[in-house]
């Protein structure tokens, strides 16, 4: 739902290398490749079912087998997966796993100078991690909120989705 806002912030980064942590369906990484044809993505997703969605979405996005080397996937947990990356990132997206020990620190250390890190949190625990992180490296917070129309009897009501706290930081 908040893919556009996240991609907009990520695409402000120079270069073409993205780490997508907690990649889920792979949408952020695949859209990154669409916007950066020379780019590459290292997607980290420990849940097998979600990695299956990623493969289906890669085909749907038209990412052929000859291009799959630009979209590599690790089934390990972050930050343990970081050592398997073939490149240092110009941009990092954290869509899940914020409360894992060392995740933000490791991603920030790996991030190239001038690079952008975007982290989205929907839980209070994730938001607490981002609040503490912001005290260390600054950056900007945005709360993203969307409501959708749905039937309420014969009328239409508006139901809010879970809001997302987004933190964006650029590494000096």
Positions of PLM-derived features:
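C-terminal substrate-binding/active-site "lid" region of AdoMet-derived donor-dependent transferases
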Residues: 106-165
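Short, small-residue-biased leader/transition segments that mark boundaries at the very start
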Residues: 1-2
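Glycine-rich helix-loop-beta junction characteristic of Rossmann-like nucleotide cofactor-binding loops
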Residues: 8-14, 34, 109
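Conserved SAM-binding loop of SAM-dependent methyltransferases across substrates and taxa
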Residues: 25-37
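Short beta-strand element of Class I
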Residues: 38-42
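Active-site segment flanking the S-adenosylmethionine/decSAM binding pocket
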Residues: 72-118
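S-adenosyl-L-methionine
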Residues: 44-87
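Conserved class I S-adenosyl-L-methionine
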Residues: 15-24
């Amino acid at each position: 739902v908040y893919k556009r806002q996240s991609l907009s912030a990520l695409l402000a980064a120079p270069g073409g290398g993205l780490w997508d942590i907690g990649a889920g369906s792979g949408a952020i990484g695949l859209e990154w490749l669409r916007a950066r044809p020379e780019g590459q993505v290292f997607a980290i997703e420990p849940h097998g079912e979600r990695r299956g969605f990623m493969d289906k979405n890669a085909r749907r996005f038209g990412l052929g087998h000859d291009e799959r080397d630009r979209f590599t996937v690790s089934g390990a947990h972050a930050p343990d997966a970081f050592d398997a990356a073939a490149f240092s990132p110009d941009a990092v997206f954290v869509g899940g796993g914020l409360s894992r020990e060392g995740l933000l620190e490791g991603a920030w250390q790996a991030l190239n100078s001038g690079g952008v890190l975007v982290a989205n949190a929907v839980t209070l625990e994730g938001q607490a991690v981002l609040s503490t992180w912001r005290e260390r490296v600054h950056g900007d917070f945005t709360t993203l909120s969307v409501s959708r129309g749905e039937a309420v009897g014969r009328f239409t009501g508006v139901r809010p989705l879970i809001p997302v706290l987004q933190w964006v930081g650029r590494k000096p």
